[in-house]
């Protein structure tokens, strides 16, 4: 069946490479570019009063009325000199930032980054997407964390992150308005600092700029396409064009053991041979045949 699986619709420059995972997961869309939907330095709504806000049960949901909340550019906190908006010392703070997604179909992946002191829980359209490990399942408004956690970015570090694939993106994002809501908690009532710097970035199929630039420290993750099939000894891999003209093929050999690979050398034109050093995402020309 020469139509079993098609390569993703991307343009490869000359002499470039692409790695396909034979996982059976059938994920062909990979990002053409990354942009930020939400950045820490955007303007956020925040609540740090001594008592809970009105309609507290729905504070993290889209459509919640936060008109009487304070506003400020992030990060929002105190101490460490990593805050654009400095607040009075507090056990906790609630943050909200509404943003627009033009077309969810153009987003293949999401990455959420969290730089925090001391604990947090993040929600996207009311669904929890990431949390620190030092808070209870449903923390009270002024609950303290069970341990300390120091922010990373102010000393040159990289924030923690979690990545979401295409199926998860479809469950989390909406066309139009979306809300990122985050609660940040301190470890003690007399803590010298509180930090909340959060970023939500998207992998886009479109090469056209639509949102915000990614932060300078952002390193795009390696996202590989996954074929709809797996491989087993004796099966044959065939590459053909859309007219079913075969370009190349190979049967999976018996002798293909861990730490060996099989391919042509030089790349794409020489004889088939076993390589004693597999080179995924790299040329075969550096391997010993």
Provide a role label for each language-model segment.
Residues 1-109, 121, 129-289:
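Intrinsically disordered, low-complexity linkers and terminal tails enriched in Ser/Thr/Pro/Gly
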């Amino acid at each position: 069946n020469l139509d079993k699986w098609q390569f993703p619709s991307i343009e490869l420059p000359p002499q470039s490479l692409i790695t396909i995972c034979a996982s059976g997961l059938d994920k062909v869309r990979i990002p053409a570019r990354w942009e930020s939907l939400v950045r820490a330095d955007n303007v956020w709504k925040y609540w740090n009063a001594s008592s809970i806000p009105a309609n507290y049960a729905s504070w993290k949901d889209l459509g919640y009325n936060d008109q009487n909340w304070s506003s400020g550019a992030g990060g929002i906190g105190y101490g460490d000199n990593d805050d654009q908006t400095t607040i009075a010392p507090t056990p906790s703070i609630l943050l909200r930032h509404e943003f627009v997604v033009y077309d969810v179909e153009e987003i293949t992946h999401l990455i959420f980054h969290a730089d925090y002191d001391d604990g947090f829980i993040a929600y996207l359209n009311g669904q929890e997407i990431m949390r620190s490990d030092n808070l209870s399942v449903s923390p009270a408004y002024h609950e303290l964390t069970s341990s300390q956690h120091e922010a990373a970015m102010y000393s040159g570090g990289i924030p923690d992150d979690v990545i979401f694939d295409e199926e998860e993106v479809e469950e989390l994002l909406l066309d139009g308005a979306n809300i990122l809501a985050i609660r940040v908690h301190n470890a003690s009532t007399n803590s010298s600092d509180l930090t909340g710097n959060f970023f939500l970035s998207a992998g886009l199929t479109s090469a056209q700029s639509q949102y915000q630039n990614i932060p300078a420290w952002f390193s795009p993750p390696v996202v590989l396409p996954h074929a709809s099939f797996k491989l087993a000894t004796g099966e044959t891999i065939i590459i053909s064009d859309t007219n079913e003209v075969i370009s190349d093929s190979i049967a999976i050999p018996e002798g293909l053991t861990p730490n060996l690979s099989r391919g042509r050398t030089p790349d794409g034109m020489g004889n088939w041979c076993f390589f004693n050093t597999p080179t995924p995402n790299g040329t075969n020309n550096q391997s010993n045949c």
